[in-house]
Amino acid sequence: MNASNNISKFPDLDNSSKLIDHILDSDDSEELDELPDISSLVPSARAQSRKQYLKNDSSNSSTYRWNIDLLSSTATIDDSVAKRRKLAVQNLLQYDSTQTFQTGDEIDELIGKSVGSNVLNVLRSNPIYDDDLRYEYCSNSKARVPDWNTLKAECLKDNDLEFNEGIIPTTFGDLLSAKLVPLDIALSICSLQFFRSLGDTTCSEWIANLEKIFYSYKSSSNNLNQIVRFIFETTADMIGIDLAKRQVPIQLERTSASENLKSNLKIKVINFLKCCGTLYRFSDDTVRFEMIQDACRILIDNQVGSFCKWQFSQFMELPISLNPDFLISNIHKVSESPRVWVTILSSLSRSCQKFRKKIAFTLFVGKQSKNDDSDFSSLCQRLDEISASCNNDYTTLLYQIRTFGYAVDEKHFKTNERLECLLEKLRKIDLTISGSTDHLLLSRCEVKDCIHRLFMVLYYLNTNSAPELERIIESDLPNNNKQKDRYFKDKTSNLSMKENKSFSAKKVKKGKKKNKRQAYKR
């Protein structure tokens, strides 16, 4: 089957979104309404080295319809359209009856040009926006401050010793390295000091001391799991984790703004994630999954999530490196919301890209990857389900498509027919999004843009188009360098000409003065 017949064109977009139409309607092609023939592109070009491809290729880049200049101009147009949409909606949110008629007219005109003439009434009838969705997992009000006498008795137990609260963590670490403190006593003192410094910057040093003790303890104690659980649960209580929410999938709610965030809660939560990174190695699977759940929920928390992204990515490297199958098989229990999935996936570090695809596949499809042909069938089936169930819920659809973007891998495109099949399914989903201005909300425009961009990314990454683009870019670079050299050369020559002129002018003035003096003497 010819790809150009199957993937004929994207649907016509409205006046406010010309992302694909601008590309397809270019004068650089004779077939204006067709995408490039995917089946005619040679997949082996991907395996060639870039230099070898450039050496062997003798095609004329001017005839290549999807050229870099066209893409650049399209991206610029798309960016300006997106800004116009957002500006219109921002103005709309500030619009009320107290404003002057002139301001109302201006806003109506702006919305009419940017997102459709009837969108004003639609937005007024649905005043709740996605930004109102919130999730709270840690809070000052639920933080349980332990009774220090009880905690001291729990930590020190039967050890008859005086507890020195002023001991410095570096000094204590030196004592540990020299093995001058028995392990039981060292663990008791270090645990108590860790709890006391949870909201302090010295907490990281006490966590490092705990790690030293655990490595020594691992081979000499059978109750290490109990010790780890005690420290984990006590710390979770101190940062105010809602234990009832730990047992159910994350559900975003429309609630009012939460209480003011105390400054030390942010530090406590960051130190809690650092502590989980240390405890994870010495925990059983039950505690490990609770740590993973807590880390994901803290990331989604509206109060503290934005402060903890880096620490979250550092923690998640542990389950990915130590037992990835355990993580992948349980990650779907955290939430059923595609919006939560995208937040988690986008916060993983770059070193986890391989496993991020596996995690995304599990979340998107609902089951683990088998690394065989059934994975492709599962992706296609899920895309068909999304296409059939799209019911004007554009926000959910947007995050589903973004999750698919994380899940899809080059191993799924063993043949051109597979690539053609996935692109056709994306086009089908795009067609299900109504083009009526009555439903032309910002979320609808965003999901169409996301589908179009993903379509182009899949096309370029899985055909020989990527080397073609590289060749075009590289062919432009020398010209740019020559222009720069010419610019500096002209600038230098202009400066030298100015210097010569000024020098000549000074010489003339000097000669005139000399003649005047000689005439005066005479």
Swiss-Prot record:
Any single GO CC term annotated in Swiss-Prot or TrEMBL for this entry: Smc5-Smc6 complex
Chain intervals with Basic and acidic residues compositional bias: 482-492
Location of region: Disordered: 482-522
Alphabetized InterPro entries for the sequence: DNA_repair_Nse5/Nse6
Subcellular localization: Nucleus; Chromosome
Keyword terms, alphabetized: Chromosome, DNA damage, DNA recombination, DNA repair, Nucleus
GO BP terms in the entry: DNA damage response; double-strand break repair; double-strand break repair via homologous recombination
Pfam annotation, one family: Nse5
Biased composition (Basic residues): 504-522
GO molecular function: chromatin-protein adaptor activity
Assembly information from the UniProt record: Component of the smc5/smc6 complex which consists of two subcomplexes, smc5-smc6-nse2 and nse1-nse2-nse4. Interacts with nse5.
Purpose: Acts in a DNA repair pathway for removal of UV-induced DNA damage that is distinct from classical nucleotide excision repair and in repair of ionizing radiation damage. Functions in homologous recombination repair of DNA double strand breaks and in recovery of stalled replication forks. May prevent formation of excessive Holliday junctions or assist in their resolution.
UniProt protein name: Non-structural maintenance of chromosome element 6
